[in-house]
Amino acid sequence: MKLEKKFWGASFLLLLVSALVYLPKVASFGYYNDDWYVMFDAHVQGVKAFYEIWRIDRPGRTLLMAPLYNLFGMDPLPYHITAYLFRFLGGMSLLGTLRMLFPKRFFFATVASILFTIYPGFLSQVNAIDFQSHILGLFLALLSIELTVKAILAPSPKTRVLFTIGSILLGWAYLSQMEYFIGLEVFRLAIVLMLVLRGKGKSFKENFTTTLLRWLPFAAAPGGFLIWRLFIFETDRRATDIGAQVGQLFSSPLVGLWWLVHLIQDMINVLLVAWGYPLYTIAYQMRLSDTLIGFGMAAFVVLIVVVGLYWGKDDDVEREATSNHGWMREEYWLGLLTIIGGLLPVILVNRHIVFPGFSRYALPASVGVAILLAAIIEQLYSRSLRMALVGFLVAVSVMTHHA
């Protein structure tokens, strides 16, 4: 009962923090960048314009935008509200997943979900129309993975089957929105492996076989999508033609080396650069009054986070849960593998994370970034230092999104 209370407390904290970060100025938001041409085409041609725009590379996006346009029309505000809700729900799905994997780790799960939800490396939240599919896709991916964990941990076969079916369907749904999010399947596989390895006394062969058998039903999501994408769907856009992009590896031996270099660069970008450079490039454009408001908002949100973390603390339980070095390795490897998995599809189609213009490519990897940073911070012995680091990262995020 106490753990359930903590979960709902963490959920409320996530809701409060994310609302303070994304909603204060939402009523004044309009169309930005590619939002303009998307909405102009829809205004002139109706919902069929969405099909014409995305039929060449991501036709599934029409399944989202057509109903939203029928509901909201040309008014930008509802799109910004739904973009925020999908962002928050993505954070909730990550929180739910980490809660099941580490039920006694309130600090770790809460900090990871907050850092993910307000991650400063994604700078296109205000492009709520063009990036609606990105944000929804990320939420659906994390919800699919949450159902995977529920299926594996479910006590009854019937419940396990229902969660498995739901997970597969959501897997197809998120891939229909954004194909390069497929890197999050590494997160799913890493979780399955982690749960299998918690069973002691098994050989490598037994662990490998068990992992494969437990993961295989969920492989229907990426497997089915790849069959459709590679052998059935015909794309007219080279940038999203998987075969053409990966085929470059065989045209020159240097391509693979450059991919490795870009992977290392982008790992540094999502882990370190995202917490400084975007704010640095944007903040200097603000007026003094906006800067002061940003500092005030950042201080207020940090205060709320610190109070919330102190409310949920249980030193004895947390210390006991983190004393096992195996669990520590679990979190580090889970975060690191998720970062690599999130970046690989981006690298393989010859894209690169550049702030602020191509910050969207950091979205899948941001899941691993949040997990890894939360795990590192949690291991610090000094509670004051832990809170200071969390406060700093939250403040940077608040200031970046405010700017």
State each model region's role.
Residues 1-403:
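Polytopic membrane enzymes that build or remodel cell-surface glycoconjugates and lipids
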